[in-house]
Amino acid sequence: METTHTVAIIDGQGGSLGKSLVEAIKARFPQVKVLAIGTNSLAASAMLRSGADAIATGENPVVVAARTADLIVGPLGIITADALHGEITPTMAVAVAQSRAHKILLPISKCNVSIVGRQDLSLGEMISLALEDIQSFLDSPPHAR
């Protein structure tokens, strides 16, 4: 029997990125448990409607998921205090940044951070690349992570 991994998807604002990620991950990796965490109830609700296995809202769920998830996926801002127009608290950013979980961060430009050398990709292209990274993670033996 295949090991079930927990993927925490963290998003804020209206949750459109998180919604797209949940849909894509559940379609490609149905065996994966997806925990969707919204920094607000609107984002959490959008991710629930897209098929997440569970949802939560706010700072403490981010902190708990950072301790327990195998993978964390979301916009780059989730490791930057005050990003997403102030929705990412310093506690959230530190919890995600220090988490032992493998992190797949999409360089969405809403956090006053520029990534030099970053390509201008569409959201769909970034999600496709994120899915490839998730596949690589799932295929790698635990000791190689």
Could you tell me what each predicted segment is?
Residues 33-57, 113-118:
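N-terminal beta-loop-helix "entrance" segment that forms/cooperates
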Residues 31-32, 98-103:
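A short helix->loop->beta-strand "cap" motif at the edges of active sites that frequently abuts
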Residues 5-41:
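Glycine-rich phosphate/diphosphate-binding loop of Rossmann-like nucleotide-binding domains
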Residues 6-11, 72-79, 104:
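Short glycine-rich or small-residue beta-strand-to-loop segments that form or flank ligand, phosphate
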Residues 105-142:
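Short, glycine-/small-residue-rich phosphate/pyrophosphate-handling segment
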Residues 67-74, 79, 128-145:
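A charged, well-structured terminal subsegment
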Residues 12, 39-42, 60-61, 78, ...:
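Short, ordered loop/turn segments at secondary-structure junctions
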Residues 54-92:
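Glycine-rich phosphate-binding loop
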